[in-house]
Structures are given as C-alpha cells and as structure tokens.
Amino acid sequence: MFLAQEIIRKKRDGHALSDEEIRFFINGIRDNTISEGQIAALAMTIFFHDMTMPERVSLTMAMRDSGTVLDWKSLNLNGPIVDKHSTGGVGDVTSLMLGPMVAACGGYVPMISGRGLGHTGGTLDKLEAIPGFDIFPDDNRFREIIQDVGVAIIGQTSSLAPADKRFYATRDITATVDSIPLITGSILAKKLAEGLDALVMDVKVGSGAFMPTYELSEALAEAIVGVANGAGVRTTALLTDMNQVLASSAGNAVEVREAVQFLTGEYRNPRLFDVTMALCVEMLISGQLAKDDAEARAKLQAVLDNGKAAEVFGRMVAAQKGPSDFVENYDKYLPTAMLSKAVYADTEGFISAMDTRALGMAVVSMGGGRRQASDTIDYSVGFTDMARLGDSIDGQRPLAVIHAKDEASWQEAAKAVKAAIILDDKAPASTPSVYRRITE
C-alpha cells in the first residue's frame, strides 16, 4: 500500500518512482481517490525533475491500462494494426488520405482522433462537415468497420485512457502542460489503447507547431519513439514542416474537399503529398507491408492511381453514416460559405515567412474552430488557394481566397492574413517538407 503524498515527496526530492508507485497514483487519478491538489503537485515535480525512460514507459502504460485496451485478435485480421498521430498544425489534413491509402495497401487503421485545439484544426471537426458522418459508432460497429473497410476515424470515448482526461485537465490549469514526459504519456496512452502493432508520429516544427522550437520538437519526437518502443509498439517519428499552411486550404469543409481531390487525383498540393507519402511509407514499413521506401512508395502510388484509396475513403464515409456517393458528389454535400473572395497583399514581393499559428487562429475567429468546448463550428468557413513560401506576389496572385459568413468576418480575416504573411524583395531559401526521421 502506498501513500500519494509519499510518492509526491519521493519525486520532489529527485528520486525515480517505481512502476508500482506510478500505477498506484494513476489508478487513484482514475478512481478519484487522489485529489486534484495531489495531481497538481506530482505534475509540478515531474515538470521540474523530469522522468527516466523506465518511469516514462511506466507512466504511459499505467495511463493506457486505466481504461479499455482494444484487442483485435478475435477478428483474425490479415494485416497489421497501424496508426499515425500528429502534434497538430494548420491545413494538416493528412489523416483523411493516409488512413484510406494504408488500408488500401493491406493495413488496418483504427484511428481515434481529436477535435481542434487552439490554432490547430481537428480531424473530427473536419469529418463532421460531411452530412450524417458518425464519429461515435459503438464498439461493435467500430470493429465491424475496421474489419470490412480497413479504416475508421472516430472520437475518443470515455473508456479509453480515462486517467489521462483528469490528469490533463489539472495540468491545463497548473502550467504543467509543456512537460515532455507528461505530453508523451498523454499522447501515447490514447494511441496505445488502440491495440497497435505499429505507430508513426508526425511532430510538427515551425511557426504553426505545438512545440515552440525545433529542439523541443525533436526532444518530444525522440521521447515518443523511445517510450512507445519501450511499451512494445514499433514506432518511428518524422519531424515535418509547419512554417506554412500544409495543404492549399485551412478550415473544415474546404480541407475535406481538398482531401477528396487528393485521393481522386484531381489536385495534389506538392508539400501535402510529400508529408502524406512519407508518413504512409513509415506505416507500411513498420507494419511490415513493405520492405523498404521504394516498395512502399510504389504500393501507395498504385492505390492512388487505380482509385482504390479513394474507394476506401468513400466506403469509410458510407460505413460511418455519411452519403454513399460522397466521393463522386462531394460538392453537393459539403457546406459552402456565404461569401468567397480573394485577399491581395498591399505590396509586391516574395513570401518570406508566414505566422502559421495566426492563420490558424484566423480560421477559429471566423467560426471554423472553438474558443471553448461549447462553441458550435461553422464548417463552411476557411481559406483556399493559400499562397506558399517563396511565391511571387503581385496584383494578380492573391494571398488566399477567404470563405466567410459575411463581409465583416471577411474583412477581419483579410486583416489577419495580411498581417500573418511577410513579403520580402528576394525569395527565401526553400525548406524541406520532412526534416528528419527518428527511429529507436
């Protein structure tokens, strides 16, 4: 039998906690036998003293085991259970293409996703722009869709990693969110509860990233790869660029439209293609569906070219109660904003920098995201035809097309876009889409 205050004292004094001590504390968070004050105290001691790798693995697995852990063995699936997690960005619509692409190559992708957070868009919010789309199928239906279609994207239910929800709520109000062991545990507890064979992490870097510097993004990626492999799940991470909006659009319906166009081959933004392909390659290799990069890319290109990936996306939408002809008739179903017009820069030059976070917040301000959990989302608003770093801007080339609910909202967004995009008289050096691959 342990005492919560003794566990806090031990960590406060700089000692490593045992697996049993960590499990006792996390189970107490779940069972409400540990107070909010005690959670806050432990979070702060971890913030200042960090955690060893064994402690980080124990924390993550204890949070995973605080609720249901999905088990796919009874389905006798003929491929690996694989998933991707992103730290979030703007125009980061990769999940909508990646899930179907990997499923079309023989993987099974039970993606438990999130809503928008701060300036970052949420995959669930994007999918809810599709009429009827059900993000909370019951457990049996979720399993059926995975078995039949190969991919489902759903919201987190209360049975998955429940200790994390309470732990995170306390961290949020005690300035202990930005602790690498605690971020790692929070992300991985939910992902590992999916019962995965392999995972790829997309850790963003730059002005729209969750972590403020390249070094911190790198440290988070290394921590996640170390802990997830320590917990028995083959995991790699990619550091990818978020110094500009990833897709050509940012919003909900506008990003779903771009995802369908990507899958059908109607339009593929080059940077979005690079990042999506790189993440899919990791999933195929870690899931042992391809032996190397070249084989993985060939398989992925084939399912894009032969329409199989688009077909899987359509089947997923239908299985989750969306329209059965969504891929063919997406424009009929997706909401469109009352006002759509381009915004132009006041001067000419090359785009040298972008405040991606500010662009994400501009979408939220237009109604495309939530400032608080109770807010309703306007799925139609956002940006399309986003200009990119290095583009030459003059009176002909707009910075973006803004889709707004009215003129006042358009004007406010136009001001934000102009302020967030910096022009210079010479073009900047190009930045890679993927900076680094991190393995154990």
UniProtKB/Swiss-Prot annotation:
It catalyses: thymidine + phosphate = 2-deoxy-alpha-D-ribose 1-phosphate + thymine. Pathway: Pyrimidine metabolism; dTMP biosynthesis via salvage pathway; dTMP from thymine: step 1/2. Its EC number is 2.4.2.4. InterPro entries: Glycosyl_Trfase_fam3, Glycosyl_Trfase_fam3_N_dom, Glycosyl_Trfase_fam3_N_dom_sf, Nuc_phospho_transferase, PYNP-like_C_sf, PYNP_C, Pyrmidine_PPas_bac/euk, Pyrmidine_PPase_CS. It holds the Pfam family Glycos_transf_3. GO terms for biological process: pyrimidine nucleobase metabolic process; thymidine metabolic process. One of its GO terms (molecular function) is 1,4-alpha-oligoglucan phosphorylase activity. One of its GO terms (cellular component) is cytosol. Keywords: Glycosyltransferase, Transferase. PANTHER family: THYMIDINE PHOSPHORYLASE. Homodimer. The enzymes which catalyze the reversible phosphorolysis of pyrimidine nucleosides are involved in the degradation of these compounds and in their utilization as carbon and energy sources, or in the rescue of pyrimidine bases for nucleotide synthesis. Belongs to the thymidine/pyrimidine-nucleoside phosphorylase family. This is Thymidine phosphorylase. It comes from Salmonella typhimurium (strain LT2 / SGSC1412 / ATCC 700720). The gene is deoA.
